[in-house]
Amino acid sequence: MGILFNRKAVGCSLLVFIKGRELIVLDVLSEGLLTEEEKLKRNGLLARKPYIAKKLANISAMEARGEISPIIRLEKSYLCNFQCTHCSAEYYMDRHLDKVLHVTDDRKKIDIAKIKDISKEADELGLARFVITGGEPLVMRDLDEVVAAIDPEKHYVIVDTNGWFLDDDKAKHLKSIGVEKIQLSLDSLVEEEHDDFRNKPGSYKRVMRAIDSTVNAGLNLLLSTVLIRGQPKTQAFLDLCQFATDRNVGLYVSYAKPTGSCTDHPEFVITKEDADILRQLESKYKVFTHMTPSYGSFKGCITVKGIITVTSTGEITPCPYIDFSIGNLYENSLKEILDRGMRNPWLGPHRPDCLIGEDPKFIKIHTEKTTGAKHLPLPWGQGFSGDDSLID
């Protein structure tokens, strides 16, 4: 029979097992479960990469045991051909350090050997998903080596890109080296709006080309967009949701948060009303956020338990938008750092709201501590620490 487990989560009872090379899903009692399309995709993965498919199928069993299986975002390089208005990584980039802060970053950087170590540790913990991000991965000269170091036979590899360099040849190449999914940034179907938001004339045409190239290469596709204040009420946003739904492609919506370049644009940060409207749209369109229940599981805020980021200096942050480290991989093992994060009162307990997007107390602490910092993220002890408390 292979892997057999019973999963009970919020409103869900799910029995999953692997028989031969087929993923079987039984006894589904809730919404948001595996669609026929999703089952076909997973069965295809099982045929091509059975080891990864079995790890993905085992995530529910891990959660039932109280274990975590976060997606690992890997930021080896912050080099980027765009300078987006809302970029959360801008303050990590050499151009910002050089031109704005007039400093250099002499911290030790992760290399291919270290990425191999991270991949091995992650595999030993049962983790299965890596997102190569940055920066812009497709400007990295060593992208092929990074993919190989992660090991696409052991981990599901996703590339997060603005699409500028993603043509037919590049998409086919990414498929050939083991990449499984492309996450493409698309902020508006109005060409001028998208180009202005990305500060890159021509970027709309390039990302539309990239959508076709991704699909034609047989890669899985996810569209991502940044939601700013008031946007859920606009026809332009509804058109974007409809565009994704018509193409049967998921649209991942990231809230604009008060970090990175958005600290200069407080008017971008969404309101509770925006978030509530978006939740209503989830029932009509193929749109979701990091807070959306999936396959019957509702983690709430996914810090540590659902996602982590490995920065170019080996720091691990519990969220792409939180500039506090929970440990450095040159000082501690991945397991030690994850355990530390889950013990932290801000990060470990279930919370129904987005910590950096909706919690005023934490946002205030984060803003005060990161303001004026020359190097991010703040290391363990300066941002998060063992003395953290939710009580004043």
Please report, for each region that a protein language model flagged, where it lies by residue.
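Flexible mid-to-C-terminal extensions adjoining Fe-S/redox cofactors in radical SAM and related proteins
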Residues: 7, 12, 28-29, 34-35, ...
